[in-house]
């Protein structure tokens, strides 16, 4: 099967044109680990390169022979270079400004570094701006850091009409004072539709040096920690023992990177959970028995104990006592029935649970066990139990004492009948006090399978009892698989990305329009669409400021579907009726930053509030985020702007670890979160 991908190619004239070339499908029906990779490719903006005829370009500095126009001459062997000489070179930031002479619907930029084997001037941190008049530039439409190599770099962003484009080089990849560009192109969308009011907004884009296939929020800093594999663009053929990571700091906008070797663990396709002490436990994947621990307070990676069973594509979940349960994972480490095991943070050991059988939770995937035990929807619950909500039709209770056990919880069904398997769908606990879980999307088989619009509400009771399951609204607006989702402070669930037919490493049949499920109304609402494909290997996380971080996709080496970026979605609750950012309530004081389950917290705010919630810090990979869950809080008004609330007394509801505390005013506008650690 062949698909068409639009690429911008530079010819020998000054004019760059867009041509369409066939692209061989990658990954279709082929296990990931068997692929061989050649060179990095990145996903270009959806659209075409704009003709560079009649452009006028200016730059802040240029070396004689390397003038500004050398970056638009269609010759990859020439390049613009800032001035260098014996008397001190001008330091960054350096700017390159394009006047296209006419207004275009701009949605991206490509930058080819110099191709002569010299790294001088390679751009690291950067920002991209648009303007209609060349004077008013506003805030960046994209910013971040590019990987330091000679491949073409892209900044993809939401379409905006503009005549002027400016690239600002903030740093040089090797810390030198120069900037150089061999070729620069600007991309246009076929049309422009302004975002509709009341449906949230996308942007800006964060350019990354890696494809973020896995991520977590660092609870003590609020930074987004991301990683790919042993390479920034590929996972196949790994030598093991190495992982490329990046982090983005929302407070500064700075993207940094780190190569992790201390844990001797390629952490691609892992299980991820934040344990009861707040350490992020990363298990298996390319190095299928390994465990790596990330400690946010010290910003350090720590080697953990090997698992009893080698695993990849397994899920894991933190339990009521702070331990971590994992099961399945036949993508790597051998294909056989991989029963449960438990990690103890106190003893730093894994213990097998031979009677916590994986067989009851298997799907009927046409690729067999290699796929059927992947990405379980796991929820730590009361009394050390773990509820498995899917993706199989069968639901189960897992028990973690002694040798473990498993008991059927029935099937995921409603008055519309028994739901099929929903591999690579999502499950979100949006009200942990009431045991409410929203499940949606997915497909019967992992790949080459049509997605579903099915959505269900599962209500948990005591461990071992059959949960109540009903159909949610009329289901999703859009069938999707390989999508992602987060629970929001107000209890709604934001759903984005995915494909109508699941094909790994293909950007075909993408879903661009997100949805929000509002449980009080039992209704899904469409939101403003984005323009960057987010499918296989994409991630989403809730930020402490109430926005959504959504990025990644690809990691397939010699392909054109690698997405080295993320976007921010700002939900409508952060805007007022005029479409401007609303004034937020602020938490000015908390009586404690650490509380035992059942304990009370008193807070002070700068204004009146009406609601509050706790949301556990999230981790995400391969459609799975078992850490996030929401607790709606009952507030007591102590007078003035002082309020108190009680944390639920059951640690199966209020799992130990780090939580985000949000307060909301009568208009539903949330605060920036304060971090609360819940202990046993």
From Swiss-Prot:
Molecular function terms from GO: galactose oxidase activity; metal ion binding
Disulfide bonds listed in the record: 59-68, 556-559
Gene Ontology CC terms, in alphabetical order: extracellular region
Species this chain originates from: Gibberella zeae
Cofactor(s) this protein cannot do without: Cu(2+)
Cross-link (3'-(S-cysteinyl)-tyrosine (Cys-Tyr)): 269-313
Annotated propeptide span(s): 25-41
Mutagenesis or variant effect for residue 536 to F: Reduces catalytic efficiency 1000-fold, but does not reduce substrate affinity
Domain F5/8 type C: 42-189
Effect of residue 331 to G: Reduces substrate affinity 20-fold and catalytic activity more than 6000-fold
Entry protein name: Galactose oxidase
Keyword Isomerase: no
pH dependence: Optimum pH is 7. Active from pH 5.7 to 9.4.
Role played: Catalyzes the sterospecific oxidation of primary alcohols to the corresponding aldehydes. The biologically relevant substrate of the enzyme is not known as the enzyme exhibits broad substrate specificity from small alcohols through sugars to oligo- and polysaccharides.
């Amino acid at each position: 099967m062949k698909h068409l991908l639009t690429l911008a190619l530079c010819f020998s004239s000054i004019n760059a044109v867009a041509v369409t070339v066939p692209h061989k499908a990658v990954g279709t029906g082929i296990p990931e680990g068997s692929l061989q990779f050649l060179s990095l490719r990145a996903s270009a903006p959806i659209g075409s390169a704009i003709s560079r005829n009649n452009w006028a370009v200016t730059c802040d500095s240029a070396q004689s022979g390397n003038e500004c126009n050398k970056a638009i001459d269609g010759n990859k062997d020439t390049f613009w270079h800032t001035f260098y000489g014996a008397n001190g070179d001008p330091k960054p930031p350096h700017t390159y400004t394009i006047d296209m002479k006419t207004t275009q619907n701009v949605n991206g930029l490509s930058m080819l570094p110099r191709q002569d084997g010299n790294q001088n001037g390679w751009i690291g941190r950067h920002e991209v701006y648009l303007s209609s008049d060349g004077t008013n530039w506003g805030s960046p439409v994209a910013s971040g850091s590019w990987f330091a190599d000679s491949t073409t770099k892209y900044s993809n962003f939401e379409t905006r009409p503009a005549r002027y484009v400016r690239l600002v080089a903030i740093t040089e990849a090797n810390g030198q004072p120069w900037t150089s560009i061999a070729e620069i192109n600007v991309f246009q969308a076929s049309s422009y539709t302004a975002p509709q009011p009341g449906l949230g907004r996308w942007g800006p884009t964060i350019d990354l040096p890696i494809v973020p296939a896995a991520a977590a929020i660092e609870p003590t800093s609020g930074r987004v920690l991301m990683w790919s594999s042993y390479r920034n663009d590929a996972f196949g053929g790994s030598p093991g023992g190495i992982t490329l990571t990046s982090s983005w700091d929302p407070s500064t906008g700075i993207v940094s990177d780190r190569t992790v070797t201390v844990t001797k663990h390629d952490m691609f396709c892992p299980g991820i959970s934040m344990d009861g002490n707040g350490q992020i436990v990363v298990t298996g994947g390319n190095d299928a028995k390994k465990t790596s621990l990330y400690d946010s307070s010290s910003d350090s990676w720590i080697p953990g104990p090997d698992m009893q069973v080698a695993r990849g594509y397994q899920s894991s979940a933190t339990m009521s006592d702070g331990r971590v349960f994992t099961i399945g994972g036949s993508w790597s480490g051998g294909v056989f029935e991989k029963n449960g095991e438990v990690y103890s943070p106190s003893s730093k050991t894994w213990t097998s649970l031979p009677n916590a059988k994986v067989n009851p939770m298997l799907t009927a995937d046409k690729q067999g066990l290699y796929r059927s035990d992947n990405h379980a929807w796991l929820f730590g619950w009361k009394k050390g139990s773990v509820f498995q909500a899917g993706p199989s039709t069968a639901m189960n209770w897992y028990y973690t004492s002694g040798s473990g056990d498993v008991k059927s919880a029935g099937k995921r069904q409603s008055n519309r009948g028994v739901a099929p398997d929903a591999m690579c769908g999502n499950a979100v606990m949006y009200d942990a006090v009431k045991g409410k879980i929203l499940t949606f999307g997915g497909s019967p088989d992992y790949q080459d399978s049509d997605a579903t619009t099915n959505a269900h509400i599962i209500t948990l009771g005591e461990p071992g009892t059959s949960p109540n399951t009903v159909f949610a609204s009329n289901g999703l607006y859009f069938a999707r698989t390989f999508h992602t989702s987060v629970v929001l402070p107000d209890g709604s669930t934001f759903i984005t990305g995915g494909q109508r037919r699941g094909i790994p490493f293909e950007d075909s049949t993408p879903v661009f329009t997100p949805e929000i499920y509002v449980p009080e109304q039992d209704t899904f609402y469409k939101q403003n669409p984005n323009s960057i494909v987010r499918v296989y290997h994409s991630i989403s996380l809730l930020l402490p400021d109430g926005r959504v971080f959504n990025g990644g996709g690809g990691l397939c080496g010699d392909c054109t579907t690698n997405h080295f970026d993320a976007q921010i979605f700002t939900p409508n609750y952060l805007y007022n009726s005029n479409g401007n950012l609303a004034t937020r309530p602020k938490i000015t004081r908390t009586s404690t930053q650490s509380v035992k389950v059942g304990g009370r917290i008193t807070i002070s705010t700068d204004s009146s509030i009406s609601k509050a919630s706790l949301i556990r810090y999230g981790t995400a990979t391969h459609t799975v985020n078992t850490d996030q869950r929401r607790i709606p809080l009952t507030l007591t008004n102590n007078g003035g702007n002082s309020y108190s609330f009680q944390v639920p007394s059951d640690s199966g509801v209020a799992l130990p670890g780090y939580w985000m505390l949000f307060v909301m005013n009568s208009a539903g506008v949330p605060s920036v979160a304060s971090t609360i650690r819940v202990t046993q």
